[in-house]
């Protein structure tokens, strides 16, 4: 028998691993070199960069520039040579050398799908694999490679989701930086207003005290001047009297009648005038309380604020957080609390106990909702809206059955109607309310709506509400004019003074 051609020993394992891409772990295909010196398949490194915001090396993470990829001809030639040797019978396949079956020393040509084991023909006859599905290695490898390809696609999509989420967190961080600066300015402005008010009140109180001191000082000086003049007049009279007493008896007695009349008309000393001391009580008595009461007259208070973190992209909340307009959709920082499928937002407070009331000025808005939403229902509605995508209707999931209780203005073929979130309820009134009063009795399970201008009851819901937050919907304005706002009305603050017993 004629000997076959001699086969040179294959390359070492470490050398073969140097020719594997660090991304796909296959021999290089169109090898390229990055600026950092690492090598990859061109397709692999490009695929990694598709899901990165900033291209970087998959191994060392050094920043990379896609335009600076250099084709590595040496690596490509080495891989081509070794693959050609494989085709000619070389032992290297790019992964591991074929191994025979340990039990039968026969070539492994089959694969048990149930046990996930490589088999030879003798293993197939074993009782352990009699009822199992067995396929040729080549066919199984092809099927598994297809599954891995699908898995690779799933992983790439997951990586894209991770990078998108990372970009969202980056946007949130930047938003918070801007918001922190803005909030610091607003907080300082509000405290400056309080300090200005206190400075004005302090100066007014000090000025009033000094004015009283000036007047009382002038009065005391005037009294002292009068007393000085009267004292001087008495001194002259005393001197005259002394001179008359030195006269001879006849002359002295002749002047006695006029002297007596003159002495009788001298001024008597007036009693000390009351109220000349500074009135400390007038200025110090409950000073802080009196200033605080006066401050209440200039301070505006609302039962709650409009939460901008829940406002959908259509809405813009005013800086004082008491009014909102619909200015058309604009991209906002994503967060789980924000409405995504409708121009809605929530109030800042959570109500679960006690009695609460507030008034809302809806004016002539063509489309609105005012009411409450169960906290858990809001979270569930947001999750369902996210699953449904942007194509959802503005009214999706926002009804009484899903934990939303409200009055709304809707547009119909025969005009506008005032409706409730209960679809089984008929239209309430013909005259559209412009200012609504909402009264929530948590323990009683009642949510009532009133027309504040007409002083009439509109509707009452009866339910176990649980934890709720004020809920609002604001449709787009009609016409080309500036958008009309929805406002939370200010409270009328009163003070009740009681004796602490």
From Swiss-Prot:
Zinc finger (B box-type): 96-137
Gene3D superfamilies the record matches: 2.60.120.920, Classic Zinc Finger, Zinc/RING finger domain, C3HC4 (zinc finger)
Involved pathway(s): Protein modification; protein ubiquitination
Pfam family, one: PRY
Keywords: Acetylation, Apoptosis, Coiled coil, Cytoplasm, Metal-binding, Nucleus, Phosphoprotein, Transferase, Ubl conjugation pathway, Zinc, Zinc-finger
Function: E3 ubiquitin-protein ligase that participates in multiple biological processes including cell death, glucose metabolism, and in particular, the innate immune response. Mediates 'Lys-63'-linked polyubiquitination of TRAF3 thereby promoting type I interferon production via RIG-I signaling pathway. Can also catalyze 'Lys-48'-linked polyubiquitination and proteasomal degradation of viral proteins such as influenza virus PB2. Acts as a negative feedback regulator of TLR7- and TLR9-triggered signaling.
Protein's UniProt name: E3 ubiquitin-protein ligase TRIM35
Organism in which the protein naturally occurs: Rattus norvegicus
């Amino acid at each position: 028998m004629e000997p076959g051609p001699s086969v040179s020993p294959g390359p070492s394992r470490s050398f073969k691993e140097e020719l594997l891409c660090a991304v796909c772990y296959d021999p290089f295909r169109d090898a390229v070199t990055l600026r950092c010196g690492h090598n990859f398949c061109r397709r692999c490194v490009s695929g990694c960069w598709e899901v990165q915001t900033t291209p970087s090396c998959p191994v060392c993470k050094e920043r990379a520039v896609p335009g600076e990829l250099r084709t590595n001809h040496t690596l490509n030639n080495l891989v081509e040579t070794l693959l050609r040797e494989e085709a000619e019978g070389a032992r290297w396949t790019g992964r591991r050398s074929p191994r025979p079956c340990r039990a039968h020393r026969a070539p492994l040509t089959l694969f048990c799908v149930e046990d996930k084991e490589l088999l030879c023909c003798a293993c197939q006859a074993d009782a352990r694999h009699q009822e199992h599905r067995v396929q040729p290695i080549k066919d199984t490898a092809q099927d598994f490679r297809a599954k891995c390809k699908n898995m690779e696609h799933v992983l790439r999509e997951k990586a894209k989701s991770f990078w998108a989420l990372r970009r969202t967190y980056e946007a949130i961080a930047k938003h918070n930086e801007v918001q922190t600066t803005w909030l610091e300015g607003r907080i300082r402005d509000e405290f400056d207003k309080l300090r200005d008010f206190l400075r004005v009140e302090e100066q007014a109180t000090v000025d009033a005290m000094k004015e009283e001191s000036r007047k009382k000082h002038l009065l005391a000086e005037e009294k002292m001047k009068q007393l000085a003049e009267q004292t001087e007049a008495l001194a002259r009279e005393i001197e005259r009297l002394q001179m008359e007493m030195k006269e001879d008896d006849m002359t002295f007695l002749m002047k006695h009648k006029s002297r007596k009349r003159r002495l009788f008309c001298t001024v008597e000393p007036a009693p000390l005038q009351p109220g000349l001391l500074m009135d400390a009580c007038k200025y110090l008595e409950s000073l802080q309380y009196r200033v605080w009461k006066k401050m209440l007259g200039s301070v505006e208070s609302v039962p709650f604020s409009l939460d901008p973190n829940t406002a959908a992209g259509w809405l813009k909340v005013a800086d004082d957080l008491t009014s909102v307009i619909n200015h058309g959709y604009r991209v906002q920082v994503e967060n789980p609390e924000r409405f995504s499928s409708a121009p809605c937002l929530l109030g800042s407070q959570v109500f679960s106990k006690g009695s609460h009331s507030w008034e809302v000025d809806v004016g002539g808005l063509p489309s609105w909702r005012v009411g409450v939403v169960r906290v858990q229902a809001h979270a569930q509605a947001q999750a369902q809206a996210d699953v449904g995508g942007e194509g959802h209707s503005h009214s999706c999931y926002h009804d009484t059955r899903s934990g939303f209780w409200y009055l709304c203005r809707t547009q119909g073929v025969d005009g506008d109607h005032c409706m409730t979130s209960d679809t089984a309820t008929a239209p309430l009134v013909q005259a559209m309310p412009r200012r609504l009063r909402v009264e929530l009795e948590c323990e009683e399970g009642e949510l009532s709506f009133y027309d504040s201008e007409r002083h009439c009851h509109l509707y009452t819901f009866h339910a176990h509400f649980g934890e709720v937050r004020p809920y609002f919907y604001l449709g787009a304005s009609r016409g080309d004019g500036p958008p009309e706002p929805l406002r939370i009305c200010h409270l009328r603050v009163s003070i009740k003074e009681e004796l602490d017993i």
